[in-house]
Amino acid sequence: MQKYISEARQLLALAIPVILAQIAQTAMGFVDTVMAGGYSATDMAAVAIGTSIWLPAILFGHGLLLALTPVIAQLNGSGRRERIAHQVRQGFWLAGCVSVLIMFVLWNAGYIIRSMHNIDPALADKAVGYLRALLWGAPGYLFFQVARNQCEGLAKTKPGMVIGFLGLLVNIPVNYIFIYGHFGMPELGGVGCGVATAAVYWVMFIAMASYVKRARSMRDIRNERGFSKPDTAVMKRLVQLGLPIALALFFEVTLFAVVALLVSPLGIVDVAGHQIALNFSSLMFVLPMSLAAAVTIRVGYRLGQGSTLDAQTAARTGLGVGVCMAVITAIFTVTLREPIALLYNDNPEVVTLAAQLMLLAAVYQISDSIQVIGSGILRGYKDTRSIFFITFTAYWVLGLPSGYILALTDLVVDRMGPAGFWMGFIIGLTSAAIMMMLRMRYLQRQSSAIILQRAAR
């Protein structure tokens, strides 16, 4: 029992800074929306539309680079720290290549926006302008993630937290300058949010790069040679590990976007209630997601040390802590669902529906915690392909069709409306949790030689 308590302490020490960093990142999006809304409703809507396209694109790149964390953790655990700098250099090359792709997609996103049904031309122009300003921040964001993944792979999660809040503090005044046109800058409205956020991402990267260069704990792996030429073998391996994670993130984000589109014809009350419950659930999701990042680090490090038993201990402890967190957040959600809904909207019908949906959200929080931590465990074992197949099957083959049938048809029961889609979420997330656990058990039952061979690739 003592080893599990010790492991839990180490996991929480890693996870808490990640949680706070994620809160800072979420707060940046909140600040953009509120400040754009203070300028005009049209600008706020433009930022919301632009963000709905930006997020899937940038999360694809973010997911691709998550492969660095278990690679660096494993090298650190095995004492091969001299190889880390080369992996990081290749991570920067990969980030640069993906940035070009993302920037191309975002530059041409106007075709998607203008094809939206009955969208106002002025709103479409502002959304396109916002994206074309924001896309210049894509390289800065992804370069920041490379440096952050280097730190987190070495079990240094506090720098990401500190620089995340630095970015938030810089974002507010820079937003104000570009939205309203102060200090000689043009008055850009919602487009100014894109300019400000792009600039902030570069500030965050420069700050993180400066920390990495000066940190005493990284002197032995400092990147003295600068940028070496691309190593196709290393980049190919990073893509093989990262692409399934990137696709899983992409399909997860697009799932919720598709459900939002399917709910939209049901009426304003249904849309508002669904959005409130979804937004609150997303905030609660920060906890298991951050714990999953910590579990990836610990499992990768233990495998690098050559101890499959300690890796199992880290995995089991992560799951135990995650379930305890989920039970607490579920009780919190059930107990305070109506006051929470009132914080978003005071319409009685909206509050009633949101409170009902939050009951369903409380049910799936345990499954959600297990599946996302299971994903973190599999990343630590470098078994990322299974993450994609499990996620795609659970969400798109089981969850979404089930939700559609329950919400919009009479095939099984009378039409349930938004609650049907939330039942679909429960089915999908529970299926994902079961499949993640089965895959984890399959991997852990393999011989130590096979597990360590895979981890060393």
From Swiss-Prot:
Subcellular locations according to the entry: Cell inner membrane
Top-level lineage group: Bacteria
Example GO molecular function: antiporter activity
Cellular component aspect of the GO annotation: plasma membrane
BP term (GO), one: sodium ion transport
Keywords: Antiport, Cell inner membrane, Cell membrane, Ion transport, Membrane, Sodium, Sodium transport, Transmembrane, Transmembrane helix, Transport
Membrane protein topology class: Multi-pass membrane protein
NCBIfam families: matE
Role played: Multidrug efflux pump that functions probably as a Na(+)/drug antiporter.
Name of the molecule in the record: Multidrug resistance protein MdtK
Native source organism of the sequence: Citrobacter koseri (strain ATCC BAA-895 / CDC 4225-83 / SGSC4696)
Gene, per the UniProt record: mdtK
